[in-house]
C-alpha cells in the first residue's frame, strides 16, 4: 500500500471550520516499513470515525518506503487529546507502531 486517504469529506469541507492540524513524519527501522503500513491500514478506519477527526491523510514516500507522512486535522485541541487517549491509538500506534520507528517528528499548526 502506497497511500492511505479514507474520508467521506472533501478537504475543503474539512477545513471550513478551522481546527488543529498535526503534521507528522515517521521513519521505520530497517525491515519494519511493511509492518507499519499494515498497522496503519487497521488504525486509520477507526481513527476516521472519531467525532473530532476532520481529516486524516497518511502517505508513504515513493522514493523511500520506510518514510510515512501524516496530515491530521482535528476540530480542536480537545479532539486531538481524545484521539491520543483512544483505545485504537493506544493499541495500534503506541503499542504496535511506535516501537518499530527509527524516527518520529510531529508539529501542530493552527489553520488560517
Predicted features by range, described:
Residues 13-33:
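Short, charge-rich amphipathic segments
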Residues 32-55, 88-97:
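Short amphipathic alpha-helical segments
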Residues 20-27, 57-84:
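Short, well-ordered beta-strand segments in beta-rich or mixed alpha/beta enzyme
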Residues 44-69, 109:
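Short, glycine- and small/hydrophobic-rich beta-strand elements in well-ordered beta-sheets
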Residues 1-18, 57-64, 93-112:
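Glycine-rich beta-strand-turn "strand-cap" elements at beta-sheet edges
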Residues 11, 15, 27, 84-87, ...:
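Residues at secondary-structure transition points
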Residues 16, 37-38, 62-63, 72-74, ...:
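Short hydrophobic/aromatic segments of transmembrane alpha-helices and their interfaces
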